[in-house]
Amino acid sequence: MREIISIHIGQAGIQVGNSCWELYCLEHGIQPDGMMPSDTTVGVAHDAFNTFFSETGAGKHVPRAVFVDLEPTVIDEVRTGTYRQLFHPEQLISGKEDAANNFARGHYTVGKEIVDLCLDRVRKLADNCTGLQGFLVFNAVGGGTGSGLGSLLLERLSVDYGKKSKLGFTIYPSPQVSTAVVEPYNSVLSTHSLLEHTDVAVLLDNEAIYDICRRSLDIERPTYTNLNRLISQIISSLTTSLRFDGAINVDITEFQTNLVPYPRIHFMLSSYAPVISAAKAYHEQLSVPEITNAVFEPASMMAKCDPRHGKYMACCLMYRGDVVPKDVNAAVGTIKTKRTVQFVDWCPTGFKCGINYQPPTVVPGGDLAKVQRAVCMISNNTAVAEVFSRIDHKFDLMYAKRAFVHWYVGEGMEEGEFSEAREDLAALEKDYEEVGAEGGDDEEDEGEDY
């Protein structure tokens, strides 16, 4: 089996995790108590969904996941919520005091005390796997736990499980909407370690997802639940081929191979289509070309970043539902002829497609309509640098005055770490610039042959 362990860190990671596991359970027909009436082979671990769930002898399905937070309130909601019987109590780890939006507390003082316990739980889950494939890590980099403890855990996972893939789903600070004053510090410090210790990081940002909810789902005032349900659809689409048998399966390591041209250039944009409310879905056909065009629209990007300002290096299109390869090839062919979707000149093919016949599932009473087919795109575009330059700019404004720095130094950080992390990000922006730059003069006429 190719198992995957999910690690949810901090409030954002846990709440996204709740939505994801709720959706997985619905997709597989697993009840909130972990029983699965449709599973005829009790205790036999050869079903495809066993990548994400382990089965007990009694036929109960337990998520291969760990939830960690430095303060108990959010995890207590899981402990008392609908799915309280689904998780093993040892998988829900909470501390006593929170990281107070401070990277240094999450990484050095408070986080240090809990990290060994987390790794111990992860080790137990890993020992339970026959062929561990990798980790999905969920966190936000604006707060203290997600950024600090998130980085610490990733660093330790690199040491303990060097060769295993680590995919991060990371919520980055939005341009306008801010939840903490020190977000720029936490994000820069945390990205510094994401660069080193994740293989693929998918950037999400709340503002972009708010706009999608408002525009496409007609929700006037979206809540975090609305946002998380949309995020969970993306994560579910990425992992369908690991959990169901499909026509063209995409493995977790395949994402890496196809999307990451250079180790540092691994920050992805994601988009999903159709995002549509039940009232509208009834009147639209939503064919393969339509949804394929939709995922390339700047407005459907899940991070505030305009792909037209950059060039694509690679895209991964994951279709699910009633889709045949012929339709996909035609749709991709159309996209290639579009002048708005530009690829770098050194990557002429640029598309990786996966198809899975399992149609998308929706949460009952949720906002999304039940549709026959959907597509999720993860793309590597040089425009992602916009996200970093925005945060770097805010970082510089604060750091020039050394504002709030004493809180970090007081928790045992050195000021040098700030400048080191900031220089690393400056280098990253430069990397993106170089990757997007045109090739030599002699290559100009070669770009047209595909």
From Swiss-Prot:
GTP binds at Q11, E71, G144, T145, T179, N206, N228. Residues 431-450 have a biased composition (Acidic residues). Mg(2+) binds at E71. GO terms for biological process: microtubule-based process. It is an enzyme of class 3 (hydrolase). The active site is at E254. The keyword rRNA-binding does not apply. Its main location: cytoplasm. Its EC number is 3.6.5.-. The record marks Y450 as: Involved in polymerization. CDD domains: alpha_tubulin. Dimer of alpha and beta chains. A typical microtubule is a hollow water-filled tube with an outer diameter of 25 nm and an inner diameter of 15 nM. Alpha-beta heterodimers associate head-to-tail to form protofilaments running lengthwise along the microtubule wall with the beta-tubulin subunit facing the microtubule plus end conferring a structural polarity. Microtubules usually have 13 protofilaments but different protofilament numbers can be found in some organisms and specialized cells. Belongs to the tubulin family. This is Tubulin alpha-5 chain.
